[in-house]
Curated annotation (Swiss-Prot):
This is Group 1 truncated hemoglobin LI410. The gene is LI410. Heme binds at residues 63, 111. The keyword Glycoprotein does not apply. Its cofactor is heme.
């Protein structure tokens, strides 16, 4: 069963909301449902993971694993990895509470050219690489679980699944 991470779990000092943390389906949705972190809120998962330097290091280590894995490396063969790392950092900063807004594409749009070739097998490989990376960097099991719950909440959009189907398969 997938954990549903409530916004209050990730940002306890910000007024709790009832919606689970989800990757935005649009920029408007992102800004409408996600309050901005403040300097008074050092408890975001982004901060707990070590902030900018730690998350950048995690992104670098994560993509080293991804491009070495034949299961998923094919999706990055024509990708400028410097640009990809920058996009991933920006998304994680937003999703983990370290940035007030996400200015990138929604997850469905960002991954649409990969579908139908992108499957749950690929999604799970990427999740595993991120989880392994965080563990190798000394992140606590609880914080890894919270981060993985945020990542899992993007599955429906990344794989372009009908929203109801994705909600059921994430449980």
């Amino acid at each position: 069963m997938m954990r549903t991470v409530q916004l209050r779990t990730l940002r306890p000092c910000i007024r709790a909301q009832q919606q689970p943390v989800r990757a935005p389906t649009s920029v408007a949705a992102a800004t409408a449902t996600t309050p901005a972190p403040t300097k008074k809120c050092p408890f975001s998962l982004f901060a707990k993971l070590g902030g900018r330097e730690a998350v950048e290091a995690a992104v670098d280590k994560f993509y080293n694993k991804v491009v070495a894995d034949p299961t998923v490396s094919v999706f990055f063969s024509k990708t400028d990895m410097k640009v990809q790392r920058s996009k991933q950092f920006a998304f994680l900063a937003y999703a983990l509470g370290g940035a007030a807004e996400w200015k990138g594409k929604d997850m469905r749009t960002a991954h649409k050219d990969l579908v139908p070739h992108l499957t749950d097998v690929h999604f799970q490989a990427v999740v595993r690489h991120l989880s392994d990376t965080l563990a190798e960097l000394g992140v606590t099991p609880g914080d890894i679980a919270d981060a993985m719950a945020v990542v899992a909440s993007t599955k429906t959009e990344v794989l372009n699944m009908p929203r109801q189907q994705g909600a059921e398969s994430n449980r």
